[in-house]
Amino acid sequence: MDTIRVSKEVPGSSKSTAQSLTESTSRTETINGSHEFKISGYSLVKGMGIGKYVASDTFMVGGYSWAIYFYPDGKSPEDNSVYVSLFIALASEGADVRALFELTLVDQSGNERHKVHSHFGRTLESGPYTLKYRGSMWGYKRFFKRSLLESSDYLKDNGLLVRCCVGVVKSRTEGPRCYNIPVPVSGLGQQFGKLLESGKGADVTFEVDGETFPAHKLVLAARSAVFRAQLFGPLRSENTNCIIIEDVQAPIFKMLLHFIYWDEMPDMQDLIGTDLKWASTLVAQHLLAAADRYALERLRTICESKLCEGISINTVATTLALAEQHHCFQLKAACLKFIALPENLKAVMETDGFDYLKESCPSLLSELLEYVARLSEHSLTSSGHRKELFADGCDLNGRRVKQRLH
């Protein structure tokens, strides 16, 4: 469908005054339809004479009536019945009907080697075909050589199958809509969030680091499979009205509840204040671990994205360890790529986070070494030698090694 936008300015308006602007849109598209015409008893219609035809029943496309005409002895005397002719004709009253056509002689062997003549799917130099009046035709006088047709897979059980597609071109102009009823955005998250803030109807309380957090069992169960099992599953605790959380810190649990109810990340400063120990990366790391524990996949992905954006020399090692522990493969790949860069490797190895990485995930060191080696193989100097990624003389465990000469 082609679209043309037209803007009109009121004449006589000056630059110093506000201009009145109106808009309209012209839309041109095709109304498509198809018809299958089966010709049985081909041997009986052959020989009926040049210019004689068999016609399909009429069919409607785009508000107009159409028919398929098959000439078994051809349409033109000059062809001397060497070719069969095939046409599509306008069968209803109409003037200057513009349309696209496709005529197909179907291969009845199942090999899909149809003979197709089509306007569709290609650029036409003069645009769609125009039929001026009832009886106007489009097609081919020499559609197929008759001798070849009679020995082909198009003829089966003394019958032919013709398929015709018609696309009638229609245009319309749309002006601005006079009436509009705005639909407000969903307030579901805000409504549940207000429910959390009010505490009304709360039927479970969580105790975290000496703080209490009231919540609603059904909301938690709907959002988290882990909470659903903990609150309503066969292995649920005897006391589901008060649950002690020991491995998640209070600010993180507060953010977790906020996401469950609001379905969006909270403002970190509003929830955790200005405590410097809760840097944004550290918050995202703890929140990712909590999201993984309670099977909140969307929150987990949000945390992965934030950690990926915040990768730096000082944070990448601990983030890599976290990604390994919680199977965050995309985040892990981003961390490995960052560390393996020659300008980053030495600095990362000198951080406390790298010491933590060696202790918590020693298997990652060999994986990192392989990654660096692969990168090294693709990093060649102009002389054809490898660049030395360990020019500082350290291995991945921080030990001094003898530098190689090139």
Curated annotation (Swiss-Prot):
- Bias regions of kind Polar residues — which residues? 13-29
Q: Which residues form the MATH domain?
A: 32-166
Q: What's the superkingdom here?
A: Eukaryota
GO terms for biological process, alphabetical = cellular response to salt stress; cellular response to water deprivation; protein ubiquitination; response to osmotic stress
Q: Which GO CC annotations does the UniProt entry carry?
A: nucleus
Please list the residue ranges annotated as the BTB domain: 202-269
Organism in which the protein naturally occurs? Arabidopsis thaliana
Q: How is expression of this protein distributed across tissues?
A: Ubiquitous.
Q: Does the keyword Magnesium apply?
A: no
Query: One short Pfam family name for this protein?
Result: BTB
- Which pathway does the record list? Protein modification; protein ubiquitination
Subcellular location(s) of the protein: Nucleus
Q: What does this protein do?
A: May act as a substrate-specific adapter of an E3 ubiquitin-protein ligase complex (CUL3-RBX1-BTB) which mediates the ubiquitination and subsequent proteasomal degradation of target proteins.
Subunit structure, interactors included: Interacts with RAP2-4. Interacts with CUL3A. Binds to MYB56 at the promoter of FLOWERING LOCUS T (FT).
Keywords on this record? Nucleus, Ubl conjugation pathway
Q: Does the keyword Nucleus apply?
A: yes
Domain writeup: The BTB/POZ domain mediates the interaction with some component of ubiquitin ligase complexes.
SUPFAM superfamilies, per the entry: POZ domain, TRAF domain-like
The name under which this protein is listed is BTB/POZ and MATH domain-containing protein 2
Gene name for this UniProt entry: BPM2
Gene3D superfamilies annotated for this entry?
1.25.40.420, Apoptosis, Tumor Necrosis Factor Receptor Associated Protein 2, Chain A, Potassium Channel Kv1.1, Chain A
